[in-house]
């Protein structure tokens, strides 16, 4: 199924389970034109129950900021701008984390004048391998995070 943009209520529900940035306030994550939550839905049919179920394959939280944050405090305090910051991404099925990043970038390129797509990623080996294997460049190593840039 195609990339979807979550409204406030759905974003709050989805982000309750954010494994990357669980401390960020739910109400902060969505604001018109500059803070968005995208997701990839997955629909399947259960033969035993004779009905369809919908789940979420992947989630990507984006803030369009005026600076590149290196901490959650900066993420929360920077203003609206033209840098798309991917600050939380997670998936429930293999390959869907990569898919949501590229689908979201394609969508944003058509909707915004933003020309930079940067992450604020946890400083983990898993995040490092994920972003580098998907073509991002390590932009900056910080004390608590790493910033990667996608072109």
Where are these regions (language model features)?
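Short, aromatic/basic amphipathic alpha-helical patches
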Residues: 129-137
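Conserved catalytic-core motifs of GNAT/GCN5-like acyltransferases
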Residues: 137-150
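Short amphipathic alpha-helix that is part of the acyltransferase structural core
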Residues: 1-37
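Conserved beta-strand-loop-alpha-helix junction that forms the acyl-donor binding cleft
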Residues: 118-129, 144-145
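A short helix-loop-beta-strand connector motif used in the catalytic cores of GNAT acetyltransferases and
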Residues: 30-58, 63-66
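Conserved acetyl-CoA-binding loop-helix of GNAT-fold acetyltransferases
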Residues: 91-110, 133
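Conserved acyl-donor/pantetheine-binding loop and adjacent beta-alpha core of acyl/acetyltransferases
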Residues: 54-85
């Amino acid at each position: 199924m195609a990339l979807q943009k979550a409204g406030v209520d759905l974003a709050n529900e989805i982000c309750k389970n954010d494994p990357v940035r669980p401390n960020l306030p739910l109400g902060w994550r969505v604001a018109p034109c500059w803070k968005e939550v995208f997701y990839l839905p997955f629909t399947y049919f259960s033969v035993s129950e004779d009905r369809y179920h919908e789940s979420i394959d992947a989630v990507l939280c984006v803030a369009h900021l005026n600076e590149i944050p290196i901490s959650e405090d900066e993420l929360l305090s920077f203003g609206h701008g033209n840098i798309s910051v991917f600050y939380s991404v997670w998936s429930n099925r293999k390959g869907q984390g990569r898919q949501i990043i590229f689908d979201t970038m394609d969508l944003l390129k058509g909707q915004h004048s933003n020309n930079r797509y940067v992450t604020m990623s946890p400083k983990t080996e898993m995040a490092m391998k994920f972003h580098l294997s998907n073509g991002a460049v390590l932009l900056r190593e910080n004390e608590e995070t790493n910033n990667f840039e996608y072109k």
